[in-house]
Regions:
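Aromatic-enriched alpha-helical interface/lid elements that frame and gate functional surfaces
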Residues: 141-213, 217
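A glycine-rich dinucleotide-binding beta-alpha-beta segment and adjacent secondary-structure elements
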Residues: 212-261
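Flexible, small-/acidic-enriched active-site or ligand-binding loops
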Residues: 241-289
Length: 295
């Protein structure tokens, strides 16, 4: 459930009542701030959670405000994925004879945990709090996004030396005319050279040059383009239903086939069926509808 702390209890649907009926139940609770703490009952959204947790301050370019990474880090990454992981772990425990338990999945906790490697790198002296000056935050010239002559963009991720050498070759640079890859004192200079060179050709031209190489160069595609890329079509990564293009379920399993639902149910379509499945009589269900308890 995703209410603020205490709401489910007021409805008589809190974990205490539910676990009393079924001690093996796994009760998942996902909130922004968690079930406890001074902010637990406060309103908030993804941007608030990742702001307090730490990641937001490190996303963006040097000398500019932090960039908002959609709602992927807090809502989906820090919230949903950790809730799912917690529920699955608790279900494994139940299958091994343990009792069910309550999962407190706070987006602020999950967002911080996603950034665990960065916290470690910072405390070890390998990561600066100055945004846009580090390896993975657009500080490095070989891990950034560059504009091409046509106005489209390329994503570059040539971290390892062998990949970096392929990048230099594709750009037409002799290794001797470019400063050492990992010398941060020259990163800005190198980035300017890369940016100027990428602007000399269209993205399609660069993709032909880097095709088949290990330069770690890929196009930056929008949601109207990504599903049309050959890699996506060959893997069948998207599907269409009711005229809407959507990603297929991930991950993929070797034995269990996962298929997307082709049609969405209308609101209330399965209400009676669900109530019957949990033991409610037809008279009770009719009463619920009449009183507006369900729809």
């Amino acid at each position: 459930e995703g209410f603020r702390p205490g709401v489910a209890e007021k409805l008589g649907l809190g974990p205490a009542e539910c676990l009393l009926r079924n001690p093996k139940l796994v009760y998942g609770r996902m909130t922004g701030w968690g079930q406890e703490g001074p902010l637990s009952r406060s309103a908030g959204h993804d941007i608030n959670y990742i702001g307090l947790a730490g990641p937001l301050a490190h996303i963006g370019r040097n000398g500019q405000p932090p960039s908002v990474p959609l709602n992927l880090v807090g809502d989906f990454g820090g919230g949903s994925l950790f809730l799912i992981a917690g529920i699955l772990a608790a279900l494994v425990a139940v299958s091994n004879g343990k009792d069910g338990q309550i999962i407190d999945a706070a987006m602020v906790d999950g967002a911080a945990y996603l950034a665990s490697p960065l916290f470690s790198a910072y405390q070890s002296g390998f990561w600066s709090n100055q945004r846009g000056t580090n390896l993975l935050d657009s500080g490095a010239p070989f891990y950034d996004v560059y504009e091409c002559k046509c106005g489209d963009f390329l994503a570059i991720g040539a971290i390892e030396p062998q990949f970096y050498n392929h990048l230099l070759k594709g750009l037409g640079f002799d290794p001797d005319e470019i400063p050492p890859q990992n010398d941060k004192a020259y990163w800005h200079e190198t980035k300017d050279k890369f940016a100027s060179r990428f602007l000399t050709k269209r993205r399609s031209e660069w993709l032909k040059i880097f095709d088949g190489t290990d330069a770690c160069v890929s196009p930056v595609l929008n949601m109207g383009e990504s599903y049309l890329h050959q890699h996506a079509t060959d893997r069948g990564a998207f599907f269409e239903t009711c005229g809407v293009i959507q990603p297929k379920p991930a991950p993929r399993f070797s034995l269990t086939k996962t298929e997307p639902s082709q049609e969405s149910e209308s609101l209330g379509q399965s209400t009676s069926e669900l109530l019957l499945s949990i033991g409610r009589s037809t008279d009770q269900i009719s009463d619920y509808f009449a009183r507006g308890i369900v729809s």
